[in-house]
Amino acid sequence: SKLEIGKCRYGLMLNEDGMVYDDGVTTRLGENHYIMTTTTGGAANVLNKLEDYLQTEWPELDVYLTTVTDHFSTISICGPNSKKIVNKMIPDLDLSDQNFPHMSFKNSSINGVRCRVMRISFTGEHSYEINIQSNYAKNVWEMSMEAGKEYNITPYGTETMHLLRAEKGFIITGQDTDGTLTPVDLQMDWIV
């Protein structure tokens, strides 16, 4: 409840021994509505552990967990022109730093299709992640490529993403961790 509606927070998932097993971003969508992202490969494990904790550690909580992994696609637009590109795609969304600071989200729409736009970054660059129903992802992808043409937009893959995040000191669980590291070992004691 400390996370304000419309805000996002990066977090680590720890085993009972305090070792890091996953990470992700939790966003507060409404008074009692959150969405949590995880690593792609860790989603099922995180959901299982949260369900276990709800039954064994927090049975008094009135919380329901639902996986929506296959319902949404995410298109990340990064770099120095990301704001201009997103503005062309969603012209009525105020992207000013005052209205849309880092680690926040806004509900919006692209050509009448509802979406969530998050100002978060795994690359360390100025970025927006557009969450859209999966059946619209191809169309929104094509729109983003068209909107970015004048800025020489270029798709990037996981190898580029890994290099960019490494330059910023961001971890990849399972690659930079092996189940034997705590947040302190990773020099991330600021998160504890």
What are these regions (language model features)?
Residues S1-M13, M19:
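Acidic, proline/glycine-enriched N-terminal capping motif
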